[in-house]
């Protein structure tokens, strides 16, 4: 939830920032894209660090970095400064979700991971839905800068809570029962590390065609997801000319529905795995989700009525986010002990697609208007549904063994 707050705050203030700092639509696309490309570049290294040092330590660093640059966003005084701040922001925030997956892989059995990921993603969407109700009144009463100062303080409070509350391993938690601990350790499907562990080549995993299909699917998903995170508010305000007093609800409705989609997707996928096995249980639910989402976004781009478009986009985002927890659960299933690296790779691929799409959106909107870029986003999301037919969650990625690694 924490790492989504700044994105929605920036999107909510986009019109005001562009007017106040004299930023064009094309330049705004570069600002949004700069965060995304930095995030993509550092996602895999930060996921690897989490595999090596543990998710708790890396998440502490990520959120403290997030808090600092959320506050720094409020100090931006022009295009170049905001561009630099957003690049550094993305560089440090990278790895948040891969390291969350590392934490979940240690604490949850395999067949509960869909629901665990659904809780994480549902909370992020719920936070995104509530953020406009917090930041827009602050922006209207004070200024857009103040909203970023407030959000930065929220991240510091979360970090203090995380330091004292979370334990890296279930065995370190005093409140867990012996029976529950034994159940988690027996069903989480992680290797037991021995003194003389085998050193493996992480990069050898990229020979897996299964992984490449996962990356391709996530690009399609991320193109749609980042439209809502980056351009959606601007699309409503400048593309559909929705009044400022209506923007809070118009911006929040899709995220409220998306939270329902996240919770539903994870729950349905876990249930489907029990009924049809992990291969089809992890495949059918997100495939239907992206199929319906693509149709809804395409429909929203083509209708003239604002209310109909907002409803269609809300339903589309709900079905699209059915995919999110399942995709991350599949990355955990396929990656095993390297789930941080694999989920980081998946997110990096998605972010690369989101970067190109975000920048391209600005150029298309300034040249052709807002309906055409929304249309192409819907088509890409629709294509992602069919890629799920080539993804098999039962096929773990095989990593090449290099040499024994002796722990001293």
Question: Where do the model's predicted regions map?
Answer:
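Extracytoplasmic gate region of multi-pass secondary transporters
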Residues: 10-11, 206-265, 323-324, 328, ...
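Helix-breaking motifs and short loop linkers at transmembrane-helix boundaries and internal kinks
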Residues: 22, 54, 75-81, 92, ...
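Conserved MFS/SLC helix-loop-helix module at the cytosolic interface between two early adjacent transmembrane helices
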Residues: 41-80
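Structural signature of the two symmetry-related core transmembrane helices
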Residues: 57-72, 280-298
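Cytoplasmic helix-loop-helix junction between adjacent transmembrane helices
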Residues: 85-124
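Helix-loop-helix hairpin linking two adjacent transmembrane segments in secondary transporters
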Residues: 120, 124-173
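A membrane-interface helix-boundary motif in multi-pass transporters
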Residues: 140-153, 243, 281-284, 363-380
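A late C-terminal transmembrane helix in Major Facilitator Superfamily
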Residues: 332-368
């Amino acid at each position: 939830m924490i790492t989504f707050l700044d994105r929605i705050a920036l999107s909510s203030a986009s019109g005001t920032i562009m007017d106040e700092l004299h930023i064009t639509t094309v330049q705004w696309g570069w600002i949004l894209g700069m965060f995304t490309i930095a995030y993509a570049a550092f996602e895999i290294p930060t996921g690897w660090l989490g595999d090596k040092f543990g998710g708790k330590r890396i998440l502490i660093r990520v959120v403290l970095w997030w808090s600092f640059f959320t506050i720094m966003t409020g100090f931006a005084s022009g295009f170049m400064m905001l561009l630099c701040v957003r690049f550094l922001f993305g560089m440090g925030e990278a790895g948040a979700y891969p390291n969350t997956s590392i934490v979940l892989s240690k604490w949850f059995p395999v067949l509960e991971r869909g629901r665990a990921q659904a809780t994480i993603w549902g909370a992020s969407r719920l936070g995104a839905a509530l953020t406009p109700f917090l930041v827009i009144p602050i922006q209207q009463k004070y200024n857009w800068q103040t909203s970023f100062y407030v959000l930065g303080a929220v991240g510091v409070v979360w970090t203090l809570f995380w330091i004292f509350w979370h334990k890296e391993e279930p065995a370190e938690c005093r409140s867990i029962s012996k029976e529950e601990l034994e159940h988690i350790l027996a069903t989480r499907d992680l290797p037991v590390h021995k003194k003389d562990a085998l050193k493996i080549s992480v990069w050898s995993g990229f020979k897996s065609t299964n992984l490449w299909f996962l990356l391709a699917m996530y690009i399609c998903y991320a193109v749609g997801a980042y439209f809502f995170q980056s351009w959606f508010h601007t699309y409503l305000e400048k593309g559909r000319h929705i009044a400022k007093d209506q923007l809070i609800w118009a911006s929040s409705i899709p995220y409220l529905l998306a939270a329902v989609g996240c919770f539903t997707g994870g729950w349905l996928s876990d249930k489907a795995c029990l009924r049809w096995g992990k291969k089809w249980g992890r495949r059918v639910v997100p495939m239907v989700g992206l199929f319906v989402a693509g149709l809804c976004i395409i429909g929203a781009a083509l209708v003239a009525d604002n209310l109909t478009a907002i409803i269609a986009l809300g339903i589309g985002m709900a079905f699209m986010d059915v995919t999110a927890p399942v995709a991350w659960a599949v990355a955990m299933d396929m990656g095993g002990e390297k789930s941080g690296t694999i989920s980081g790779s998946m997110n990096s691929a998605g972010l690369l697609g989101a970067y190109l799409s975000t920048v391209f959106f600005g150029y298309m909107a300034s040249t052709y208007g807002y309906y055409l870029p929304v249309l192409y986003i819907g088509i890409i999301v629709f294509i992602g549904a069919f890629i799920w037919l080539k993804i098999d969650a039962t096929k773990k990625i095989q990593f090449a063994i290099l040499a024994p690694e002796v722990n001293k």
